[in-house]
């Protein structure tokens, strides 16, 4: 029997807690002993599919040639096994072989493993761009096509979603309106039960159409009663660099449409975020915008060379980097100093020696190779200050969303490019205020806290050794039995395998016990939903003779996930339709632990007073760490109490955030930017670079790269209004100083609103003028608070924005929970908690 325990009893056996007597409060970037990971996790693999089964992950697709990579932790993929060979009647005699296997989809259903993928062969002999379907009784194959005389469906990027009622849906991409996402219902045997239904195509005039009309790579999950589809938009090629991941929400599996799309990409190239926060010194080195003075560089001996001149008011004292995006062989010199750009196409940030720069006029010489094949796509110069630059990472795509090893976390497995090399990456998915948020794109040098996937506290092939010491936990079982009546027993509740499910084959059980509420899925079918259970102990037992069951995999992890009316175990607090109503006091839930995550959504209903939040770490009333929101002052208050003495740190909630027009309220005549909750807004920022000439929106050559695309005064071109209830009111603004000269900033008296509207002031002005802008806000009424404790370090976040790290002097077990002073009417919409291993 393979059994693994880790820290399972740690919070139980330590009855006497060490006080946090010599703990220290640190709100700077603190080092953490938590295990991290380095992207990419698999080099050289592009469009792929990923499946979790019985505690292992299987990944295959482009450049795996019919193989699966295998991992137990999403990070290490050393095992590789061959599972499939492309050999059928409809590809015979063509060049469509194993190298044409694209965009795998793998899943387990009723004793069979299913492999779907798209052949993507555009040969001179034949075009073979179809989806096929193969099966195997073993996860490691060999897989055989169900029919070898014809393909399964058209055209690319298959994904099969099983709803919690057991119904199956195939999502795919057809070449109808550009690349368009469609969905089609299926029977349990993977035959079709209805016609395909168009979901959506890419939306003109948005981030989805920076180049081509492409919507592809759909992946669907259901979480907390909502359906989420992640997808790709724009051309996949790194020569464009525009590929991004978006999300669409729906209330039904075939109900995805333009109105459900997030207005923004959830994962994009980090080149964009650099320009959002750093001014390009080639244009703004003098403190204000200046055009690049260019001329022909024939005197260099290369007629295709260009000379660019830029002005610096002073030589930057920080870390300076030159961004160079080029397609092979570009040569660059700064004031005569050569940049070793290499001969290959690449996205790079090159560190620049301060001695190479000078106050006043500086010169860039850019030469193409003499054969004239090199192309410059983008060039910029940045002052990063004390920051170190990350690698330039672009074209995130082909998403797969899987549960992490501990069963609580969600992880995104996807491809991305570092330069021109495409590989597999992983990043954590969070749900913040109901929205899907991705902690990425990340590389080895990405700033911030990016812990590795958490492992289960117990993993093995038996449940007999699990103590079930907590009243809240997740148990995952992959097991089979020949018994006609088979299932599990918890307290007074028996959950049976439905008659419609086959016997004597493995089934995947997901059992969530949240105090006295029980939820069970079998093969992703919801068979028990938040039913009350009375227990004398918390153990899960197998129905009948346990010797008649074969357990392939069991994983146990303490924690709970609750939302809406499904709260339990909070003592005197009660839940309504929309969540848990906070009263005055403090409430703790779960055993003490040394490593955990707590994520809480709060809605203060436009409170004008009161503090509320989370108890991040609690030993006793004289030793704790709390993170609270002060509604009246729009602040985050962090209290660290040691032996009754409290050290308080206060940070403003105010932020400036990039927003995109909401397509539901936007057309060619006006743009509306909407907020999910009431937001207190007091500033707007507009990029001086025109959205019609975004350098990331086109396949640029050197001439286009240096062309002037500057708008001196964006704000005055717009009539701006804010939404007051259901009434639009004009916004009275004034010009303000911007910390980034690449952005124009205007301010106004704070307004509480859910929307802003922009209309071109001149009726004859048909330009876009604005698209991506920044909104400055004091606070919002709905917030997601998250704490991640890893040993001594407690990382704190509000709306996925870091508010620092508290570092304890001793790694002692603590509890966590909710708190409020009772002055604000606060509703807790969801809580996710789990012990981290």
Show which residues each predicted segment covers.
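Hydrophobic core segments of beta-strands in well-ordered, beta-rich domains
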Residues: 46-65, 102-123, 145-148, 157-184, ...
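Short beta-strand-plus-loop segments that form exposed binding edges in beta-rich domains
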Residues: 365-373, 417, 543-547, 758-766, ...
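Extracellular glycan-recognition regions
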Residues: 274-286, 291, 386-387, 434-661, ...
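Edge beta-strands of jelly-roll/beta-sandwich modules across compartments, strongly enriched
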Residues: 371-381, 549-554, 764-777, 826-831
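Aromatic, loop-rich ligand-recognition surfaces of beta-strand-rich domains
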Residues: 560-561, 606, 653-732, 737-779
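Short beta-strands within extracellular/lumenal beta-sheet-rich domains
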Residues: 294-313, 464, 595-597, 655, ...
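Beta-strand-rich ligand-recognition modules
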Residues: 303, 317, 325-384, 502-504, ...
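Surface loop/turn signatures of beta-propeller and other carbohydrate-active proteins
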Residues: 34-52, 75-107, 123, 140-162, ...
């Amino acid at each position: 029997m393979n059994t693994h325990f880790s820290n399972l009893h740690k919070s139980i056996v330590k009855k006497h807690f060490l006080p946090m007597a010599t703990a220290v409060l640190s709100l700077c970037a603190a080092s953490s002993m938590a295990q991290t990971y380095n992207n990419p996790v698999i080099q050289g693999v592009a469009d792929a599919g990923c499946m979790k089964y019985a505690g292992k992950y299987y990944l295959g697709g482009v450049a795996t040639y019919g193989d699966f990579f295998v991992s137990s932790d999403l990070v290490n993929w050393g095992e590789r096994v061959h599972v499939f060979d492309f050999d059928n009647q409809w590809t015979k005699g063509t060049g469509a072989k194993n190298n044409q296997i694209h965009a795998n989809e793998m899943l387990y259903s009723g004793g069979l493993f299913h492999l779907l993928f798209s052949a993507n062969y555009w040969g001179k002999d034949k075009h073979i761009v179809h989806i096929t379907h193969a099966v195997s009784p073993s996860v490691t194959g060999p897989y055989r096509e169900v029919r070898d005389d014809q393909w399964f469906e058209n055209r690319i990027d298959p994904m099969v979603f099983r709803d919690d009622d057991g119904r199956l849906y195939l999502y795919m991409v057809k070449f109808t309106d550009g690349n368009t996402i469609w969905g089609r219902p299926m029977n349990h045997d993977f035959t079709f039960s209805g016609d395909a239904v168009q979901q959506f195509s890419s939306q003109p005039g948005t981030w989805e159409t920076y180049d081509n009309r492409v919507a592809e790579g759909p992946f669907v999950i259901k979480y907390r009663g909502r359906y989420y589809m992640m997808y790709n938009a724009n051309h996949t090629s790194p020569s464009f660099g525009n590929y991004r991941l978006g999300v669409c929400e729906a209330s039904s599996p075939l109900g995805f449409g333009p109105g459900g799309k997030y207005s923004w990409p959830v994962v994009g190239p980090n080149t964009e975020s650099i320009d959002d926060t750093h001014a390009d010194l080639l244009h703004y080195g003098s403190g204000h915008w200046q055009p690049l003075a260019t001329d022909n560089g024939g005197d260099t001996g290369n007629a295709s060379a260009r000379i660019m001149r830029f002005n610096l008011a002073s030589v930057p004292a920080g870390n300076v980097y030159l961004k160079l995006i080029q397609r092979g062989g570009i040569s660059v010199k700064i004031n005569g100093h050569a940049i070793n750009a290499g001969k290959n196409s690449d996205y790079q940030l090159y560190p620049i020696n301060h001695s190479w720069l000078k106050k006043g006029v500086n010169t860039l010489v850019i030469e193409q190779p003499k054969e004239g094949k090199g192309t410059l796509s983008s060039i910029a110069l940045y002052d990063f200050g004390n920051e170190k630059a990350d690698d330039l990472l672009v074209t995130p795509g082909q998403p797969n969303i899987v549960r992490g090893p501990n069963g609580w976390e969600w992880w995104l497995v996807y491809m991305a490019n570092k330069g021109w090399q495409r590989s597999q990456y992983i990043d954590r998915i969070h749900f913040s205020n109901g929205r899907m948020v991705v902690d990425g794109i990340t590389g080895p040098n990405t700033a911030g806290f990016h812990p590795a996937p958490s492992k289960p506290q117990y993993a093995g092939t038996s449940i007999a050794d699990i103590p079930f010491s907590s009243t809240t936990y997740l148990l995952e079982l992959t097991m089979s039995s020949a018994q006609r009546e088979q299932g599990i027993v918890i307290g007074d509740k028996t959950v049976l395998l439905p008659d419609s499910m086959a016997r004597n084959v493995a089934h995947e059980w997901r059992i969530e016990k949240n105090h006295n509420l029980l939820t069970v899925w079998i093969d992703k079918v919801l068979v028990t939903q938040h039913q009350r259970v009375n227990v004398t102990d918390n153990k899960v037992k197998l129905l009948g003779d346990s010797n008649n069951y074969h357990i392939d995999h069991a994983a146990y992890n303490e924690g709970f996930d609750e939302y809406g009316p499904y709260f339990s175990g909070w003592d005197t607090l009660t839940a309504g339709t929309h969540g848990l109503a906070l009263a005055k006091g403090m409430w703790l839930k779960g055993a003490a632990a040394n490593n955990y995550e707590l994520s809480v959504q709060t809605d203060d209903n436009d409170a004008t007073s009161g503090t509320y939040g989370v108890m991040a770490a609690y030993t006793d009333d004289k030793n704790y760490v709390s993170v609270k929101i002060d509604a009246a002052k729009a602040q985050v208050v962090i209290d660290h109490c040691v032996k009754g003495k409290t050290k308080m740190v206060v940070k403003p909630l105010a932020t400036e955030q990039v927003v995109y027009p909401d397509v539901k309220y936007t057309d060619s005549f006006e743009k509306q930017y909407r907020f999910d909750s009431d937001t207190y807004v007091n500033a707007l920022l507009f990029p001086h670079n025109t959205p019609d000439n975004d350098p990331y929106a086109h396949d640029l050559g050197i001439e286009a790269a240096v062309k002037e695309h500057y708008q001196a005064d964006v704000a005055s071109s717009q009539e701006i209004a804010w939404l007051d209830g259901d009434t639009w009111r004009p916004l009275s603004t004034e010009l303000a100083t911007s910390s980034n000269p690449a952005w124009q900033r205007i301010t106004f008296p704070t307004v509480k609103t859910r929307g802003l509207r922009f209309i071109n002031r001149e009726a004859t002005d048909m330009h876009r003028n604005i698209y991506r802008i920044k909104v400055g806000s004091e606070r919002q009424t709905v917030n997601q608070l998250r704490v991640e404790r890893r040993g001594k370090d407690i990382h704190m976040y509000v709306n996925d924005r870091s508010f620092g790290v508290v570092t304890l002097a001793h790694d002692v077990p603590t509890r966590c929970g909710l708190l409020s002073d009772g002055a604000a009417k606060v509703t807790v919409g969801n809580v996710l908690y789990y012990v981290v291993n």
